[in-house]
Amino acid sequence: MAKTPDGVSLKSDLTGDVAVVTGATRGIGAEIAAALGELGATVYAGARDPDDVTAPDQHALQMDVTDDGEVREAIDRIEREQGSLDVVVNNAGVFPRSGPLHEMDLSDFDRTMAVNLRGPVAVTKHALPLLLEGTGSRVVTLSSGLGRFTDGGMDGGYPAYRLSKVGVGGLTAYLDAEYGDQGLVANAVSPGWVRTEMGGDDAPRSPSKGAETPVWLARFAPGSPSGRLWKDHERISW
């Protein structure tokens, strides 16, 4: 196993690992799913419409992360077909544009929390029994620089999105504290401003660039750092 400058131990490939990626049909999620497959993982690509999953080497998985029944059935299917699960990438997200809190529509808040925070909670909850059967299973959850509450970075609107990503930080810290001694490696990642349907055409990063650090985190070997926020292969403050 190679050593990174951060002292993180990386798996050289993911052969034999089973991974599920939510929101895997476009943008960063599609790039993550493709890269995990190239590393040898068996990839389940979660989507609200499984017909949108076109990669022949991926298993299309119906999974609206706001539908608890679909999430449960998706994880049950992975268990039936594979008997194990090693990597969960919580990527599905929404980004409603809004001004400051007093201008926000509460329906936007509810929808954003349902997808961006409750979704990762539900997926991880149902996946945990399988994840904990292995050694060093990984949970990677997409966060954002807009959810960092240090360095005076919480102004500028988008309250629903910002608060949902603050919650992702709490989820990540909780998973490490609660399950880290059982071998779970849980981290969050800021992919940067990426040219996607959410990020818009003016964003400086390509989806493949945005996927690099999430895929890197999915390669973390047992005992690697957990409960942290990362960007560009480096730890950053919450």
Spans of model-derived segments:
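N-terminal Rossmann NAD(P)H-binding glycine-rich loop of SDR-like oxidoreductase domains
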Residues: 25, 33
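Rossmann-fold cofactor-recognition segment
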Residues: 57-69
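Active-site Tyr-X3-Lys motif and surrounding loop/helix of classical short-chain dehydrogenase/reductase
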Residues: 73-80, 99-114
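Hydrophobic positions on the long internal alpha-helix
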Residues: 89, 123-127, 131, 171-172, ...
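Conserved NAD(P)H cofactor-binding loop of Rossmann-fold oxidoreductase domains
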Residues: 91-98
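Catalytic loop of short-chain dehydrogenase/reductase
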Residues: 94, 106, 110-113, 132-181
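C-terminal helical subdomain
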Residues: 181, 188-189, 200-238
